[in-house]
Amino acid sequence: MVEDTPDDLVHELFTESFWRGHALGRPILGTKETVESFSREALRDYFTDTYSAPNLIVAAVGNIEHERVKDLVAHAFEGLPRTSRPVTEEPPVVVPHTMVRNKELEQSHVCLGTSGYQQDHTDRYVSYVLNTILGGSMSSRLFQNVREKRGLAYSVFSGLSAYRDTGSMTIYAGCANDAVGELIDVVVAELRRLKEEALPEPELRRAKDHLKGSLMLNLESTSSRMSHLARQEIYFDRQFGLDDTLAGVERVTADDMQRVAHDLFADGSLGATVLGAVNGLKISRDRLSLG
């Protein structure tokens, strides 16, 4: 099904290339070959090893009584195994690759990316603000310079993916087949500019306010609060309030932004995947240079 949604497919292809040889690079749905190879015994063994008491976190929010929820959980899951197989997966080693896949499409889909930070990294708040400025809103640099100023793409944005021991920052854009080269050049120029030029204070203020507003809106629904609690337990082994997160965002300085931009956008760190009718397109490492 992902083959029919090229904007999803280009992300899957990028991920496969970026995390090459690691579990993070495998497609979530699997492949036809892997799914066909599943046996009843393999599924049962995986379920038994994975869905065990040490691996279980239950998050609940709303008009509830804590002790009542504890009793319900204890009763419902009392039959779960009390031990589990330890996870020994090593953090991935990223070697950025360039990939071009020809596919007859009305437009090309481009995904660029660098390594990012894990969930509990001390500079995670800086990366949140950096992403907001780069491509996280309609006032972001990519939206303004790629779409509004040059008309190269209708959809362009950046995003962060953070895991327990690694992460990534990706940039996506859909553009005309003959505009891929110019699009990549503009994105690379924006990444370099974040490294080389001090961030104006008004732009930093706008990004902080936008990010804080988004964080507050995201926690208005009970389902979002529930997911937020679960993530905190998974990655931090504790709970902390929205005020702590907002304070972390507010502490970010322009110097922090430039320092983290140098860290994330180091020369040689940028990978690229292009999907579309781009026969003969070549993307050299020099073109992706962030030095």
What are these model-derived regions, one by one?
Residues 1-84, 100-101, 105, 111, ...:
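Charge-rich, well-structured scaffold segments of protease-associated domains
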Residues 88, 143-144:
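Phosphate-proximal small/polar/acidic motifs at interfaces that engage nucleotide phosphates
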Residues 91-92, 124:
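Double-stranded RNA-binding/processing signature
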Residues 93, 146:
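Active-site cores that bind ATP or allylic diphosphates and position pyrophosphate for catalysis
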Residues 126-136, 142:
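A conserved active-site cap/scaffold subdomain adjacent to cofactor or substrate pockets
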